Amino acid sequence: AYAAGSGLLDVMLMFLLVPALERLFNLTTDFRLAELTSTNNPLIKRLFNEAPGTFNHSLTVANYVEACAMAIGEDTFLARAAAYFHDIGKLKNPNYYVENQTDGHNPHDEIAPELSVSLLKKHIMYGVMLAREYGLPKELESAITEHHGSFPMKFFYYKARKITEGELDLKNYSYDGPTPTSKINGMLMIVDASE
């Protein structure tokens, strides 16, 4: 009876102490990642309700990135969580992103390509702000900042070339980086660009 009671007490203490220790020492455990990727997570719920196209895109990316992570022996929990949250910045002005344009109206048709690039790049900054507001781990924050690397937005570059005389610098139509610093973020960048 003593052994059973002691074991039960140990399990209860573990469930109470692990979250506190995770936050105290800034650790990201599989328990924390599982909690974050739950459909009960408030940020996941917001994505589902406010930007459903982005939510579906994130789920698809998560499935591919998780499979890639498993294939090369990387942390599948972290890979899935990174994919779930990489585009949370799209919660600000979700209609600027094609996956959320359900009524056929694209606001980018009415504005200059340079403004479109500026607006689209801001989802990175907004994503970092939300990650900090919701207390997401640093690993997920880096996935947000790195998932586009310095890829160009060629659609807007070519659109600008059609209406602009002279040379244009492709860097002005590209994401600001940084490039991925982990295998998971690199896989996320590739899968996100191809999905």
Which residues fall in each region the model found?
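Divalent metal-dependent catalytic cores for phosphoryl transfer on phosphate-bearing substrates
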Residues: 44-195
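Non-catalytic interface/linker regions that flank or bridge core catalytic/transmembrane domains
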Residues: 1-45
